[in-house]
Amino acid sequence: MNQSLLAPFGTAIERVEAGLNALRQGQGVLVVDDEDRENEGDLIFAAETLTNAQMAMLIRECSGIVCLCLPDEKVKALELPAMVEHNSSQYGTAFTVSIEATVGVTTGVSAADRVTTIKAAIADNAKPSDLARPGHVYPLRAQPGGVLTRRGHTEGTIDLVQLAGLKPAGVLCEVTNPDGTMARLPEIIAFGALHNMPVLTIEDIVVYRKSLLAKVG
């Protein structure tokens, strides 16, 4: 990762703390993974604070494949099976079947409908029958252990919202350029500056979590 580009955002610890503060305030954060992995940046919001305007941004400025990151126990509680029996994707991205709220939506595609679906899924009393399958929101199952187990955006999202003291559910979408290509670090930093969003990396979250473990130890 080109640390010189990230230097204006502070140290790894400072970048994560800025991200946590943004999430607590209901704002978005940009998270970049390792250059030797997907080398992509995702725009992430806490699911519980997600607004229709923020969903519209995810649809308009990003790839449009809006994903809901959930911990393993929530996926099991909602009885969401894996999208495929044998996952052969390069990085083992753990998609479940797609979902739609059974109440309060029309076609399920609009920003408002997708937010309604997400709020239905993350409700404390949510039941499998609250969600139709398939739909227009794509849940992702996070590995237990977070980024210390798997260095993916799914795990990074759950780690961040939990570290921020929020409900363990987050929404992400890959940032794209206007021409449809994937945004890399320079474009992601420019996007963050334009929208006043902090930028951090999966590696930063690893460093932050290890520092917390060291303090406990």
UniProtKB/Swiss-Prot annotation:
A Gene Ontology term for the protein's cellular component: cytosol
One Pfam family per UniProt: DHBP_synthase
Cofactor note: Binds 2 divalent metal cations per subunit. Magnesium or manganese.
EC number: 4.1.99.12
Swiss-Prot/TrEMBL cofactor(s): Mg(2+); Mn(2+)
Keywords for the protein's UniProt record, in alphabetical order: Lyase, Magnesium, Manganese, Metal-binding, Riboflavin biosynthesis
Catalytic activity: D-ribulose 5-phosphate = (2S)-2-hydroxy-3-oxobutyl phosphate + formate + H(+)
Function recorded in the entry: Catalyzes the conversion of D-ribulose 5-phosphate to formate and 3,4-dihydroxy-2-butanone 4-phosphate.
Family per similarity comment: Belongs to the DHBP synthase family.
Protein name in the entry: 3,4-dihydroxy-2-butanone 4-phosphate synthase
Native species: Shewanella baltica (strain OS195)
